[in-house]
């Protein structure tokens, strides 16, 4: 299993006075079981690159292959890709939106077509993984501490059981 970027370029506001080349000729392969760190200065393209990994942003040029399939190919199932490549944002607490923690963590699995019971089972397991017990299930995610919000948001991605976690 791998996620491969081949000569990926990305330009913000192409053809305008505000054109910015955020990514230039990026070649990268992420293989199963690898842990990869991405470092760089503010504005160096780290977040832009990460957004390409599950198709949130489309490369201006180049290809991205998941399990050997071009994600920009006609008819590619981007919904499936996004459930297989889980993305935790730089400020994951901004991902929270439901009325309680358990509902928030269930959102992804429910969008994958799971029943309420199946989604809750995955959500409970993910919340346990990040150290949030039953006492948090019915709390508003907005009443949690900053660290608890981050853990709840990460649990929301883990509950979808992605093959790759970014």
Label every model-predicted segment.
Residues 54:
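Helix-to-loop junction immediately C-terminal to a conserved catalytic motif
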Residues 62-73, 81:
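Conserved ABC transporter NBD signature motif
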